[in-house]
Structures are given as C-alpha cells and as structure tokens.
C-alpha cells in the first residue's frame, strides 16, 4: 500500500519488475533497508535501478520494465483496493478468503495470535 507518497508508488513498481526475475523479496528487503523520508526523492529511478544492479538482475529487462511503467496500473489498482477496504495506515493487512470472498482487516503491528484468530475465523 503506497501511502508514503510518490516515492512509494515507483518503489512498488520496481518490486514487481524485480519479481519478473524471481527477486521480489530480495528487492523488498533492500527497499526496506534503504528507504528514505517520505517524498524526499529517495526512490528515484536511478536509485531503484542501482538496487536491482546489486541483486545481479538482468538490467536491460529491469530498466525496460521500470522505464515503461509496466506495473503502474497494478500499483494504482492495489492502492484503490486497499483504500476501498479501509486501509489508511501502515501496517494494514486485509485477509481474504478467496473461496467465500469474506475479508477481515488487521490494523497496526499485532501479535501472531491476532493473525491466527483472524485467519481461523475466515476458514
């Protein structure tokens, strides 16, 4: 959920570009470790590309993905879905039973027991 401003939206796109090469979580860790202040410009294209380079991604593929805004609509749709589900802060988790469509929201840093209870209630 890109709520930290313009930097977050482009960073979210970059994670999907990394995922094209099987490196979503590796890229996510780098973003988390090197994130800057909200709207400070920390997630500009050059910096995001340097993170990809450090993961030994195919840079031609990554650059094309990021430069073409391949995942712009996906990021916008995720933001719209999160907003419609009542997410307005991080962390917010929307747990969905894909068979029934029922969902529950968990807001804030919660202990495992809250997640366990929520998931079990949706089964």
In which residue ranges do the predicted regions lie?
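Structural alpha/beta surface segment adjacent to cysteine/selenocysteine redox centers
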Residues: 1-53, 85-88, 120-123
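C-terminal cap of thioredoxin/glutaredoxin-like
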Residues: 46-123
């Amino acid at each position: 959920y890109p709520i930290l401003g313009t930097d977050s939206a482009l960073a979210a796109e970059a994670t999907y570009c990394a995922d094209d090469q099987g490196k979503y979580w590796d890229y996510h860790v780098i973003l988390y470790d090197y994130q800057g202040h909200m709207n400070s410009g920390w997630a500009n294209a050059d910096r995001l590309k340097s993170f990809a380079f450090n993961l030994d991604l195919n840079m031609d593929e990554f650059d094309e993905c990021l430069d073409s805004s391949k995942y712009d609509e996906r990021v916008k749709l995720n933001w719209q879905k999160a907003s419609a589900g009542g997410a307005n802060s991080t962390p917010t988790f929307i747990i969905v039973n894909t068979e029934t469509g029922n969902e529950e929201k968990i807001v804030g840093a919660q202990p495992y027991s809250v997640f366990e209870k929520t998931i079990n209630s949706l089964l």
